[in-house]
């Protein structure tokens, strides 16, 4: 068995995101401590991780060079936070998206960690200035926002507090790369970070197009899944522009006036209520009934698709 990577990693919270982070860090050879205040929660989490890793190994989708058993041997549980922080180089907070709860956790960590550990939050929308301001170790704090499901979607948004040191950002970026993720540096905090701002822009226009009777809900989704989404799985919108003409300058010269004309026709922010909600809900429930069994099955299918796509992207040589 290969030697563990230098330093331990602590995961605070053993839900879906916490389990995913534990698997990712173990795949990179790190010893992982999984902390939760509820022992039964940790027991269930470890069993879930074991089943998932065995399944991934059988399908050839397990990350890292270690076997499932070797990775599992790197993951341990703990219920004492003061003991859990001993020897760790990185702490990844994964508790529910509640500002008061997260601030409480970071206040506890702030009082027991040294000056070397990185304090990282998995928050999807809470600004670092709300989470970390006032902490003694604020220079060591950063948001590392994963995308659900983190094991199959490698993007991680790194969002620093205004007082976060450049060294903390660099260390976290290098760590994410080491465990096979694709970190991006959000240079300054902004509500929604980058991914959700792009996602909400798409959702907003999609909603307006359905609301105004331009396209049906099912066809709207098809535009993304069988159109834009196929390109965006491999190249982003800016490179798409670059390739759709003789470079970026050519694209802007050719198409900027048309883009501005269309953009001026965009409407106001939708209310996401009323008749359109019923229309969209009816279309979605026709495709996937909104009961636990059907939703779980569809999520499983989605994750299988993402698993295969991730495998394909790993196999393809980046240009």
UniProtKB/Swiss-Prot annotation:
Impact after mutating residue 36 to R: Reduces enzyme activity and alters specificity, so that NADP can be used as cosubstrate
This protein's GO CC annotations: cytosol
EC number assigned by the record: 1.1.1.45
Entry's localization field: Cytoplasm
Enzyme class of the recorded protein, top EC level: oxidoreductase
SUPFAM superfamilies: 6-phosphogluconate dehydrogenase C-terminal domain-like (SSF48179), NAD(P)-binding Rossmann-fold domains (SSF51735)
One Pfam family named in its UniProt record: 3HCDH_N
GO molecular function: L-gulonate 3-dehydrogenase activity; NAD+ binding; protein homodimerization activity; structural constituent of eye lens
Superkingdom: Eukaryota
Modified residues (N-acetylalanine): 2
Keywords recorded for this protein, A-Z: Acetylation, Cytoplasm, Eye lens protein, NAD, Oxidoreductase, Phosphoprotein
GO biological process terms on file: fatty acid metabolic process
Phosphoserine modified-residue sites: 3, 111
Main location: cytoplasm
Catalyzed reaction equations: L-gulonate + NAD(+) = 3-dehydro-L-gulonate + NADH + H(+)
Binding locations of NAD(+): 16-17, 36, 97, 102
Biological role stated in the UniProt entry: Functions as a crystallin in the rabbit eye lens. Has high L-gulonate 3-dehydrogenase activity. It also exhibits low dehydrogenase activity toward L-3-hydroxybutyrate (HBA) and L-threonate.
Oligomeric form and interacting partners: Homodimer.
Name of the protein described by the UniProt record: Lambda-crystallin
Organism for this UniProt entry: Oryctolagus cuniculus
């Amino acid at each position: 068995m290969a030697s563990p990577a230098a330093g331990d990693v602590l995961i605070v919270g053993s839900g879906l995101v916490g389990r995913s982070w534990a698997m990712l860090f173990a795949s990179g050879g790190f010893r992982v401590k999984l902390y939760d205040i509820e022992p039964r929660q940790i027991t269930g989490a470890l069993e879930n991780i074991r089943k998932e890793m065995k399944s991934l190994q059988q399908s050839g989708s397990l990350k890292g060079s270690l076997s499932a058993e070797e990775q599992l041997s790197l993951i341990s549980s703990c219920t004492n936070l003061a003991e859990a922080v001993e020897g760790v180089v990185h702490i990844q907070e994964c508790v529910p998206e509640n500002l008061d709860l997260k601030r409480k956790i970071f206040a506890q960590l702030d009082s027991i960690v040294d000056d070397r550990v990185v304090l990282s939050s998995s928050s999807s929308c809470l600004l670092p200035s709300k989470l970390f301001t006032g902490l003694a170790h604020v220079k060591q704090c950063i948001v590392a926002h994963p995308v659900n499901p983190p094991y199959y979607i490698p993007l991680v948004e790194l969002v620093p507090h205004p007082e976060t040191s450049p060294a903390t950002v660099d260390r976290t970026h290098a760590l994410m790369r080491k465990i096979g993720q694709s970190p991006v540096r959000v240079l300054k905090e902004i509500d929604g970070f980058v991914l959700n701002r792009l996602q909400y822009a798409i959702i907003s226009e999609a909603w307006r197009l359905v609301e105004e009777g331009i396209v049906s809900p099912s066809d709207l989704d098809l535009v993304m899944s069988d159109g834009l989404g196929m390109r965006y799985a491999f190249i982003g919108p800016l490179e798409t522009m670059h390739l759709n003409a003789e470079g970026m300058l050519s694209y802007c010269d050719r198409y900027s006036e048309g883009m501005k004309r269309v953009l001026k026709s965009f409407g106001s922010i939708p209310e996401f209520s009323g008749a359109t909600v019923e229309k969209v809900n009816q279309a979605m429930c026709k495709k996937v009934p909104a009961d636990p069994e059907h939703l779980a099955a569809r999520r499983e299918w989605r994750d299988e698709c993402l698993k295969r796509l991730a495998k394909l992207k790993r196999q393809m040589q980046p240009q």
